[in-house]
Amino acid sequence: MRRILVVDDDLHTRLAIRTWLKRCGFRVAIADGGPNGLAALDDATFDLMIVDIFMPNMRGFESIRIFHQRAPTVPLIAISGYAFSGPETENLACLKMALSLGATRCLRKPFRPATLLSVIDECLSEAEPHRRYTATLAAVATALSEQPGAAAPSDISMERIATG
């Protein structure tokens, strides 16, 4: 079962997203802002993050950069009712900034559950090859380290094994 972290300062948004995603079979953790969201990342592993751009104790788009740095391989969907509500040229600038800071996709609030689920499916599908690659590296490292007298493989040798 896929785990999703939802970080938004708006209670109704958090609860609505959690309800939709649980009905679709996801395990969902919610956080009411940046500090609690970052703490959740320290406590658990997630397959996807949904992060509001503008929250208290975070400086706008800075939230995307911080969450992406903490979990660079986890797809991040940036959501905002503010950042993507301006004129078309302003929306495009906000979108480019969010993507350049680490967002995989962006959604403007409010959005329909079907739209969110479609974007989640796209993000998880795109991330799947990397997830399998990482799991394979971990399995090979474990198998090699369990060999009698074997030295722990380095990241470089693991990379060579995985890529041939």
Regions found by a protein language model. Give the residues of each.
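Receiver (REC) domain active-site loop signature in two-component systems and cognate sites
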Residues: 55
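Short amphipathic alpha-helix used as the core "switch/output" element in two-component signaling
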Residues: 39, 61-74, 93
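Alpha4 helix (beta4-alpha4-beta5 surface) of REC/receiver domains from two-component response regulators
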Residues: 62, 83-105
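Helix N-cap/capping motif at the beta->alpha junctions
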Residues: 30-39, 60
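Two-component/phosphorelay signaling modules centered on CheY-like receiver
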Residues: 11-29, 101
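C-terminal output helix
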Residues: 99, 105-121
